[in-house]
Design a protein with these regions (language model features):
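A conserved short coil-to-beta-strand element within the FAD-binding core of flavoproteins
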Residues: 1-13
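A structural signal for short hydrophobic beta-strand segments in well-ordered beta-sheet cores
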Residues: 2-5, 73-75, 154
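Short beta-strand segments that buttress and anchor functional surface loops
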Residues: 14-18, 193
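Central helical "cap/lid" subdomain
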Residues: 17-68, 101-105, 120-122, 126-127
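Short glycine-/acidic-enriched loop or helix-start segments at secondary-structure transitions
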Residues: 39-41, 96-98, 200
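Conserved FAD-binding catalytic core of PHBH/FMO-like flavoproteins
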Residues: 58-88
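Conserved FAD/dinucleotide-binding core of flavoprotein oxidoreductases
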Residues: 79-128, 133-136
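C-terminal catalytic lobe of FAD-dependent flavoproteins
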Residues: 128-244
Length: 244
């Protein structure tokens, strides 16, 4: 659980973890994919939970770079003393994580067949799929968070109830932005909903968060439209504008 500390203390937030001592910090960045909704400060942040599974097969694909199409495959690496190739990944909305499944191994093989059929043969995956025998494959399954517009949610977090109250005039006139202070949850930042594109969005998101946290007064290096498009408050503004 995440709790605000008394204003007199040096820390702004207390993190309580079952069976462990509490942690205290001035700055907390929530980078927990779909699990951020377990925290009271983020229960109303809307996004979809998406299950994804990767597949790892024995064999060297000899790639020097990642190939990407319907799916992707990364260059081979040594895993537990054996050269193996990892590829994927499935995309199933509103499904939980858990153990890898043979059906999703097959999905990954079928995706690879569309983008790199030669690698499919090289690794013996065609025969494996035809026989339905996946015992030599390993996998990893987890969940992603994906938001409306396939854009991540990155930036400082505001108190939703107070935001909706202070800016309620927007319900009557979307252009009439009240001269009110945004009720920030000071020291609390969010980085989630990177979906299946985290390798692209995470680096610039980290830079933006750094500048927010360090109190940069000039964020002009980033397009204003970008900051607005990924900001957590966009959902609260949308609630008001469209009277949701």
């Amino acid at each position: 659980a995440l709790h605000q500390c008394a204003p007199s203390g040096s820390a702004l937030w207390r993190v309580d973890i079952e069976g462990q001592p509490s942690l205290f910090a001035k700055i907390v960045v929530l980078a927990m994919a779909d699990q951020v909704r377990q925290l009271s400060q983020c229960t109303e942040i809307p996004f979809t939970v998406v299950r994804g599974q990767t597949t790892t097969a024995p064999g060297d694909n000899t790639l020097k770079v990642v190939i990407s199409g319907e799916g992707y495959m990364a260059p081979s690496k040594m895993i537990s003393g054996e050269i193996k190739s990892t590829f994927g990944a499935t995309f199933h909305r509103d499904q939980p994580g858990g153990a890898p499944t043979d059906s999703e191994h097959l999905e990954n093989i079928e995706m690879l067949a569309m983008s790199a059929p030669d690698l499919l043969e090289k690794l013996g995956l065609s025969a494996m799929a035809a026989q339905g025998d996946f015992h030599t494959l390993m996998g990893r399954a987890s969940t992603r968070a994906s938001a409306m517009g396939s854009l991540p949610i990155v930036g400082p977090i505001a108190n939703r109830a107070l935001f909706l109250e202070r800016f309620k005039a927007i319900r009557l006139d979307a252009k009439a932005i009240p001269d009110a202070e945004v009720p920030w949850e000071y020291g609390l930042y969010l980085s989630t909903a990177h979906g299946s594109r985290g390798m692209i969005s995470a680096p610039i998101s980290a830079m933006i968060l750094r500048d927010y946290i360090m109190g940069a007064t000039d964020l002009s290096r980033y397009p204003t439209a970008l900051l607005a498009a990924i900001h957590p408050n966009r959902f609260y503004y949308r609630e008001l504008r469209y009277d949701l």
